[in-house]
Amino acid sequence: YINYFVLVPDAFDRMANEIRSICADRHGMLWLGTFDGLYRFNPTDNSFVRYETRSRKLPNDTYNNLVNALYIPENTPDLLYVGSSSGLVVLDIRHPEQPLGTLRAEDGGLTDNDIKSILSYDDTHLLLATADGLTLYDTRSCQASAYYSSLSDPTSLPNNSLRTLFRDRQNIVWIGTDSGLAKLDLKRKKIDCVRLTNDRKGAERKVIVNDLLGPPDHSLWLTTNEGVLRYDSTRRDAGYTRYMADKGVSHSIAKRLIRDSHGTLWLGTNDGIDYYDAARDRFVRAEHSN
């Protein structure tokens, strides 16, 4: 490992080192969403540049320093969507000091300003998971559609507090919420809640789903506050496999998943990083060596 601490030498160091999201652009730069704004890291010279309200490089009150989500669409690789706790900001990565646009709940474009995850559905539509519902935003017409939870509607979200989004190869959008998993078929405009139970007669588990990761196989991986779940998304009545300490997971609160270029699955937890050993069907702690 190489450690990078203290991004900037001022009073906000601790907040800046709490990284919420990372995104790489086509020029090799890393963009970091932190508790103290947006940073760009240049790996060629190990330099950081901060973009936040106090530095006036993003001179509008739409942009809040807490950045939860970063997203660069494949079809527009020079656009960076920045999801903060007070709305959405669109940047051109070639000129990030000049925001191209903003979107806030007050403008009628968001279900809530606190954005947790951003995802492209197609070339013109963005999905924005927020702390109070899901927004489908048309980037051409600037029109928005909202999806909420409703106790009287079994085809609605299980909870309005959303955490993560993932789109699979069949264009099904999987949604991680504070009350479990849902999937959205935008062609049918239908949401299905997914029962997370291994027993058809058993009580459904209302787990907090922090992150989602899909193929190469048919498994949908979920990180939760009760370990890691592997769910077979191809089987309608499928249960799940749970990975906790007995399966090598370092901490029951599992946060983030990523698959590297070699196909290895990496897991971030509240107590370190693990990787998945497929041959043994268990996670192994990645030890830090100085």
What are these regions (language model features)?
Residues 1-290:
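Carboxylate-rich, polar loop motifs that coordinate divalent cations or form catalytic acidic clusters
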